Amino acid sequence: MKYTTFGIISLFLSVTWALRFELAASFEPKPFCIRDFVEAGNQVVITMESDGRVGDGQVLSFYVIDSMGNEHRRKKNFAEKLNVAFTAPSSAVFDVCFENKAEAAGRSLMRNVEVNIESGSAARDWDKIRSAEKLRPAEVQLRQVEEMSDEIVERLNYLKLREERLRDTNESTNRRVRNFSMAVIVVFAALCAWQLNYLKNYFRAKHII
């Protein structure tokens, strides 16, 4: 049973997810973005591979930017394989965006792009760590599980703090709306009282009442 469980964990850790898509060339290309989340201090490794070549009538560009406004990498007119690595300065959502600009009219062109994004423990070079610390394969896998568990806890804590901030913002907005509504009611009531008093004085002046 222990070996079966450990084998399942090993299989889970060895899975690598990649996104493949086609990006048509256009004179005014719209960005095609892939979004992910990373905790503060974690390393992110992005591997991109495209078919075609530089000078084939298409200018494939990309940039990496996070929700805090930090631009981690930008490159224009790339083909084949490219690796990008950066360390997140803060917990944030980041976007990997692609644009494919056509250089000439009359041709229907596109690029096939494959993107693989790894962060945290998945982005570390575990073979190098195993050699440096002289760890056995089982110890390496346990270290991976431990780090992944820590990352899950960190992400849950971040989501909890974010939920608290959103709740505080929501409650503050509700208070402002309620206070504004009360102020509108008071002003409306005062205006009605003033209008009634004005009409009463007007009718008295005209000897209507």
Swiss-Prot record:
It is a single-pass type I membrane protein. Keywords: Endoplasmic reticulum, ER-Golgi transport, Golgi apparatus, Membrane, Protein transport, Signal, Transmembrane, Transmembrane helix, Transport. It holds the Pfam family EMP24_GP25L. Its main location: endoplasmic reticulum. Residues 31-119 form the GOLD domain. It is found in: Endoplasmic reticulum membrane; Golgi apparatus membrane. Residues 19-178 are lumenal. Disulfide bonds: none annotated. It comes from the Eukaryota. Residues 1-18 form the signal peptide. InterPro entries: Emp24-like, GOLD_dom. GO terms for biological process: endoplasmic reticulum to Golgi vesicle-mediated transport; Golgi organization; intracellular protein transport. Residues 200-209 are cytoplasmic. The chain crosses the membrane at residues 179-199. GO terms for cellular component: COPII-coated ER to Golgi transport vesicle; endoplasmic reticulum; endoplasmic reticulum membrane; endoplasmic reticulum-Golgi intermediate compartment; Golgi apparatus; Golgi membrane. Constituent of COPII-coated endoplasmic reticulum-derived transport vesicles. Required for efficient transport of a subset of secretory proteins to the Golgi. Facilitates retrograde transport from the Golgi to the endoplasmic reticulum. Belongs to the EMP24/GP25L family. PANTHER family: TRANSMEMBRANE EMP24 DOMAIN-CONTAINING PROTEIN. This is Endoplasmic reticulum vesicle protein 25.
